[in-house]
A protein has these predicted regions:
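Short, charged/polar "capping" segments at the starts of alpha-helices
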Residues: 25-30, 53-54, 88, 124-131, ...
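Active-site and donor-binding regions of nucleotide-sugar-utilizing enzymes
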Residues: 1-56, 308-309, 329-420
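Short acidic-hydrophobic, aromatic-tinged amphipathic segments that line or gate anion-handling sites
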Residues: 137-143, 197-211, 322-326, 423-426
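Donor nucleotide-activated moiety binding/catalytic core segment of transferases
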Residues: 118, 122-165
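Catalytic binding pocket for nucleotide-activated donors in carbohydrate/polymer assembly enzymes
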Residues: 40, 45, 128-136, 162-233
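Conserved catalytic-core segment of nucleotide-activated headgroup transferases in glycan assembly
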Residues: 48-129, 204, 275, 279-289, ...
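A nucleotide-sugar donor-handling region in carbohydrate enzymes
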Residues: 4-88, 221-229, 237, 242-243, ...
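Nucleotide-activated donor-dependent transferases that construct or modify glycoconjugates
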Residues: 79, 83-84, 260-276, 302-303
Length: 436
């Protein structure tokens, strides 16, 4: 969850976006990131413009670029392009010795009179490889564009890297070497089951070498899967993608888009999961009973500060879309003081506080142009007043507030702070209309 908590906000504030292919559009954007039903922008049904480079780059040009970078060969080119496996941007889990041994194992088990093996690594470890004299000779530098490189690659070996999508359009064989499949799946997850891959998958390099030695048979065996994914992902990769995207984005011409809308009633729950007394148990039970055939549900919550808070969110019904408010209010110190202290001191009205939120585009920062039919706020006693101001500026017609008795008394000490709610109740169990 922490790895993607900014991404949804970025997507919701972006239009147009490029789907890249049907897999990315359907499985990643619409399902994995749950944009289906909430994204109001345009999701262009186009490949990435960079695929034009794979299609349009001449072999002579690409080989000249490689020669300039110190890479020369008259053999068939195999590129091993493992994905980066660091958990953080400044953390690397790669064992360079392991990487070097992998290349040696491949070379010792294939016909090196026919093939040359090169590396294309993530730039996070490229500098480390340059310190190794032997490895630096076979590592493709970044002066050679990845898609220019792919235009002349004969066999690609990868794992979970999205590089294979760019290569898929060439029709050339792809092999998947996945020595850490279980760990990677548990820590980062896979969008495509390995059994659907357009090439053989193995945890053993000797197997990969065997596939290379029998590559024509492998191509025949995996042709149905390759063709199926090609049909799904590469149909529109015709070398003219850039022109169509420029026309759609900058010239306003109509282009095919993927539909992200549904007819469900859109519910937005505002409940800061990190605050005590938020009634997590009651909310979890409610989410388990909602009629998801009728309702599209989003939970806007605070950034988890403890592991148990993250785990509690992960246990919610998977159909609940979670948006995390993980940044502080976009306001100056004096403006924040005007909100948090001024309201309680009766010196700042809710409308004055709301104006600060509007100037900072606080609502749009969190949900973009998303439209909701109902807002349900669950507010514990310790919740800061800025959540009430946020609910005030929300462009949603129907608003409900659920509070405990003690909080209700506290809230009514500031009656104008809750006057914008159409309904106030003191128990989540009273919310019956959303249940199956």
């Amino acid at each position: 969850m922490n790895a993607t908590q900014n991404i949804e906000h970025n997507f919701l504030n972006t239009t147009p976006m490029i789907a890249a292919n049907h897999f990315t559009g359907e499985r990643m954007f619409k399902k994995a990131y749950m944009l289906d039903g909430i994204y109001e922008g345009k999701l262009l049904d186009e490949p990435l413009p960079r695929t034009d480079t794979v299609r349009n780059t001449s072999r002579e040009y690409a080989m000249a670029k490689l020669k300039e970078a110190g890479i020369t060969t008259d053999k068939k080119i195999i590129v091993y392009a493992p994905t980066w496996k660091g958990q953080l941007y400044n953390s690397l889990d790669y064992d360079l010795t392991e990487l070097k041994d992998a290349v040696k194992t491949l070379r010792s088990n294939i016909n090196t009179d026919e093939y040359e093996v090169f590396l294309r690594v993530h730039y996070f470890i490229y500098r480390a490889i340059l310190m190794d004299e032997e490895m630096s000779k076979i590592c493709i530098p970044f002066t050679v564009d990845t898609d220019e490189l792919l235009s002349v690659v004969d066999i690609l070996i990868s794992d979970y890297s999205s590089i294979f999508f760019d290569f898929l359009g060439t029709g050339r064989p792809i092999l998947f070497y996945v020595p850490d499949l279980k760990d990677y799946t548990e820590n980062r997850g896979l969008y495509i089951p390995m059994e659907e891959m357009p090439g053989p998958v193995s945890e053993n390099l000797e197997d990969i070498a065997g596939y290379i030695n029998n590559i024509e048979e492998i191509k025949k065996e995996y042709k149905p899967k390759y063709d199926a994914m090609y049909e799904w992902c590469c149909q529109k990769e015709d070398g003219g993608v850039s022109d169509r995207v420029i026309d759609a984005v900058f010239l306003g011409k109509e282009d095919e888009t993927m539909n992200c809308k549904n007819d469900k009633t859109k519910l937005l729950f505002m409940a800061d999961w990190t605050r005590p007394f938020v009634n997590q148990v009651g909310l979890t039970k409610l989410f388990n009973k909602i009629n998801y055939d009728k309702y599209d549900v989003t939970l806007l919550t605070g950034k988890p500060k403890k592991k148990e808070q993250s785990k509690a969110l992960e246990k919610l019904d998977p159909r609940v879309r979670i948006l995390v408010n993980n940044k502080r209010l976009n306001a100056t110190w004096s403006e924040k003081n005007k909100i948090f202290r001024g309201i309680r001191a009766r010196k700042t009205s809710i409308e004055e506080a709301a104006e600060i939120f509007r100037r900072g585009n606080e609502w749009q920062r969190l949900v973009g142009d998303s439209k909701f039919d109902e807002l349900i706020m669950v507010r514990p006693k310790s919740a800061p007043l800025n959540w009430l101001v946020l609910s005030y500026v929300a462009p949603i017609k129907k608003k409900s507030l659920v509070v405990t008795e003690t909080v209700r008394e506290s809230a009514y000490e500031l009656p104008e702070m809750v006057a914008h709610f159409d309904e106030i109740s003191d128990n989540l169990d009273k919310i019956q209309r959303y249940k199956k």
